[in-house]
Structures are given as structure tokens and as C-alpha cells.
Amino acid sequence: LANILNTLDVEEHFGYMQSTRDFHFNAYDIFSSLVFARAVSPLSKHKTFHDILPSLFKPVDFSYDQLLDAVEFIGSEYEKFVEIFTVATRENFGIETKHTYFDCTNFYFEIDKENRFQRKGPSKEGRHDPIVGLGLLLDSNMIPIGMKMYPGNESEKPVLRKTIQDLKKQNNIDGRTIQIADKGLNCARNILEAIDHCDGYIFSKSVKQLSETERTWVLLENDYTPVYDGSGEID
């Protein structure tokens, strides 16, 4: 990971970005330390700072409060940082956009009150915590090349359509985008939108909720190809 970050050579961009803040720490050093710690053991920022960072090869020369300030700074400018890393990845490793993939997910926050961004919205788990939605665009090799966050109370269906087009335009992508979605985004409008833009889609749907005709078709044994694991068992 350290070699990849060094090859991307984005530290100077972090310096430019943090020049507008009166920080007494290096935001890039904190960012890179968090990346390494996340790969070792994905924990909360508190546990990461106290349990993981001291064991890494880089000395910790910043406080926990400074870490939180850096996280707030990077989060507030996340779209610019994503663009910086996307450009650096394209220049140093290449990005394959003949086919791209797009998916949405949610993040929960254990806070008592909502704010303008962390809002209560639909939850498959039935939770009532405020959430933030995330749309992620991946290249053909599953490398993230674009992302968009939005308030958790917004419907993902229109967000899906707008975010895909915005991210494709921003990254100059004219290839085919495959939309990956569960039943929450599985609607006729999204399917038509994908077809109209010559894109594709993989939408899941509950077999129990299918019509009798569709359920019969899904359960047919023909046209399925067995996939075996290393022991010769069907995977």
C-alpha cells in the first residue's frame, strides 16, 4: 500500500488543499496512516488511533483530536480528493472504462439527532438511526473512480439515475455502465433509463414475490451452469 501511495504521488495536492486551513499537522500523513490501519484492522477511529496506529511502521506524531480534524477536512472536500486520486490512478496505472459498475449503499450513524446530511431513511434492517447514502462508480477492474454521497432521507431511485450520469460526465466515460442494485432500486424507470443509455443492469428480486410465471422460469434447471469449488463440490 505504501508503494502504491508513493506511486500515486498525491501528497503535494493534500498540501495545496490544507493550505486554506490553519492546521498544525500534515493531513496526508494522517490520511495514509488511516489507509494502512484500515487494511490491517478496520475499526472505529478511536480504536484505530489507540490500538492500531502505534503498531504500524510510521510513528504517530499527531493527536486524536488532530486525526478527527483531518477526517472532517477530507470528508468536507471528498469529491475533490476522489478526483485527485482518480486522475493519479489513470496517469500511473490506467483505468479501464469500457465497462463500469455502479452500486449504492448506506452508512449508519449512532447519533441521537439528525442533521442536514445524516437523515433517517428506509432501512432493510429496520433500524431508526440516521444514515448517509453512497453511490460508487467502479472501472472494469473494480477500481473506484467516482463516488457521491447524499442525505439518507432521499429516495435512491432518482439519485441512482442522476449520480450515474453525473459521474460518467465528470470522468469522461462513454462506455457501458452496469447498475448493481437490490430490490429497493429495482424499478421500471431505472431499467428503462439503463436501456435508453445503452447501459446494463443486475437487479436482485425476491423469488417469493415473483409472479407464478416468473417463479417457474427462475426454478427451471436448464440454462444453469454448475460452478465447482476446489473439492469438486458445487459452490
Label each PLM-derived region with a short phrase.
Residues 130-132, 146-149, 197-235:
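An anionic, glycine-rich sequence signature occurring as long contiguous blocks
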Residues 148-170:
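Active-site beta-loop-alpha junctions of metal-dependent nucleic acid enzymes
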Residues 155, 180-189, 207-209:
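Acidic, metal-coordinating catalytic cores used for nucleic-acid/nucleotide bond scission
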Residues 111-113, 187-193, 212-215:
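A short acidic (Asp/Glu
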Residues 172, 191-200:
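Short, surface-exposed basic-aromatic patches at helix termini and helix-loop junctions that form
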Residues 42-46, 167-170, 180-181:
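A conserved hydrophobic secondary-structure block that centers on an alpha-helix together
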